[in-house]
């Protein structure tokens, strides 16, 4: 067995004579105060039986103190015990031993956030004038009326729920054209917020914390939905009253521009 090193002056600053009672050659033989004669005892008249093994082990002082603190707290708890304790009974004691503390995180680490499962659903959208959204060319959405013969032209969006400024009315989401993996995003062009489509790597996206330009705050209004840009508040995904016009980002509600959409499941 390797010799025990001498205590340095720095280590002595954390040394207490009481530590000698915990670590002896053949295990603890005596303890001061309320821990005396606990080799075989009960916590109260009817409680948890405590047995201390005198077999030497390699548990650290931290382990010993953790056990002692827990036992001291349990000794102060009074509860009825008309039958032997079961696992469920012991679980209820954890809240008496441990104190729950909130974890405050001011910033997100994408390395951890991306491990969380992304909830996604497939939908089609029509504006309240019954115009469907179709892909025109490679990177442009247009709104037009479709009939039974060409209904298959409407795009299917995968809507994913992500982190954002969520409240009781607004839900942060991203919208991706499922077939082409094109994401709706909001950028500033020529001094004006603009809606565009961006192709992203499906191995990376969607992720729980998306770049803000991709995030829309979804709000339900009388059975319909609207999508407000997170990057540009008070700017919404909009369509024109005219036929086959591009879908755009607008800041007018209740006027000529249409911001309310009918959402139908495509899953």
From Swiss-Prot:
GO cellular component: cytosol; extracellular space; lysosome
Gene3D superfamilies recorded: 2.80.10.50
Compartment list: Cytoplasm, Cytosol; Secreted; Lysosome; Secreted, Extracellular exosome
Keyword terms of this UniProt record: Cytokine, Cytoplasm, Inflammatory response, Lysosome, Mitogen, Pyrogen, Secreted
UniProt-listed PANTHER family: INTERLEUKIN-1 BETA (PTHR10078:SF30), INTERLEUKIN-1 FAMILY MEMBER (PTHR10078)
Subunit comment: Monomer. In its precursor form, weakly interacts with full-length MEFV; the mature cytokine does not interact at all. Interacts with integrins ITGAV:ITGBV and ITGA5:ITGB1; integrin-binding is required for IL1B signaling. Interacts with cargo receptor TMED10; the interaction is direct and is required for the secretion of IL1B mature form. Interacts with HSP90AB1; the interaction facilitates cargo translocation into the ERGIC. Interacts with HSP90B1; the interaction facilitates cargo translocation into the ERGIC.
Protein name (record): Interleukin-1 beta
Species this chain originates from: Felis catus (Cat)
């Amino acid at each position: 067995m390797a010799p025990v090193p001498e205590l340095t002056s720095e280590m002595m600053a954390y040394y207490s004579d009481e530590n000698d009672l915990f670590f002896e050659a053949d295990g603890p033989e005596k303890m001061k105060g309320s821990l005396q004669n606990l080799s075989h005892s009960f916590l109260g008249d009817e409680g948890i039986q405590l047995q201390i093994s005198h077999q030497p082990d390699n548990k650290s002082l931290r382990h010993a103190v953790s056990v002692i603190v827990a036992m001291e707290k349990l000794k102060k708890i009074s509860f009825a015990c008309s039958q032997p304790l079961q696992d469920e009974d012991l679980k209820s004691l954890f809240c008496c031993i441990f104190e729950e503390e909130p974890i405050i995180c001011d910033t997100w680490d994408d390395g951890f956030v991306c491990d969380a499962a992304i909830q996604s659903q497939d939908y089609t959208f029509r504006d309240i004038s019954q115009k469907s959204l179709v892909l025109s060319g490679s990177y442009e959405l247009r709104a037009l009326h479709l009939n039974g013969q060409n209904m298959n032209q409407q795009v299917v969006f995968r809507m994913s729920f992500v982190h954002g400024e969520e409240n009781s009315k607004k839900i942060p989401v991203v919208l991706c054209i499922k077939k082409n993996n094109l994401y709706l995003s909001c950028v500033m062009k020529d001094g004006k917020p603009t809606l565009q489509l961006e192709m992203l790597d499906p191995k990376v996206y969607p992720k729980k914390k998306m770049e803000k330009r991709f995030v829309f705050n979804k709000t339900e209004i009388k059975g319909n939905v609207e999508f407000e840009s997170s990057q540009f508040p008070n700017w919404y995904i909009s369509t024109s009253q005219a036929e086959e016009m591009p879908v755009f980002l607008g800041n007018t509600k209740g006027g000529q521009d249409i911001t309310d959409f009918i959402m139908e499941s495509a899953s």
